[in-house]
C-alpha cells in the first residue's frame, strides 16, 4: 500500500469517525468471508459502516477525529455510524450468532465504553419502538373508554 493510499484511507476514516456517535471495535479472526459479507449486509441495512483497517491507520484517524483512548491490538474490524443504538445492535446481534466475532471496545458519546455498555445499548428499544410504546400508552385510556361505551350500548340494547 502506497503512502498516498494510506493518506486517502485515513481521510475517509477520519470523516466517518467525526460524523459518528459510536465506534465499535471487534475481533473478527476466524470468520469466513461469507460471514463477513453477512455482517456488512446487516450493517448496510441499519446505516452502519463496516471496515477492516490496519490499527496504525485507524489510530491516526481516531486521534485526528478527536476519538482518543481506544487501545487497538490484534486484528480489528470497525463498525461506526450516527446512531449509537444501531451500531451497538448490529455488533451485539452478530456477536450472539457467531462465536468467532467478539466486541472488544467502543467509543460512544465522546468516551471509551466497555463491552457491557455496548450490550446494554443493544438491548434498548429504538426510537421508533419507543414512539410506538408511547402512542400505545396515550391511546389506552381512549380505547378503554370506547370499549366501555360499546359495552354499555350493548347492555342497553339487550334490555
From Swiss-Prot:
Per UniProt, what is one GO molecular function of this protein? large ribosomal subunit rRNA binding
Its keywords, alphabetically, are:
Ribonucleoprotein, Ribosomal protein, RNA-binding, rRNA-binding
Q: Cellular component terms, GO, for this chain's entry?
A: large ribosomal subunit
Short name of any one Pfam family annotated for the protein:
Ribosomal_L10
Q: Which GO terms describe its biological process?
A: translation
Q: Domain of life of the organism in this record? A: Bacteria
Is NADP a UniProt keyword of this protein? no
The UniProt entry, under HAMAP family, shows: Ribosomal_uL10
What family does the Swiss-Prot or TrEMBL record give for this protein?
Belongs to the universal ribosomal protein uL10 family.
Q: What's this chain's function?
A: Forms part of the ribosomal stalk, playing a central role in the interaction of the ribosome with GTP-bound translation factors.
What is its quaternary makeup? Part of the ribosomal stalk of the 50S ribosomal subunit. The N-terminus interacts with L11 and the large rRNA to form the base of the stalk. The C-terminus forms an elongated spine to which L12 dimers bind in a sequential fashion forming a multimeric L10(L12)X complex.
Full protein name: Large ribosomal subunit protein uL10
What is the protein's species of origin? Campylobacter jejuni subsp. jejuni serotype O:2 (strain ATCC 700819 / NCTC 11168)
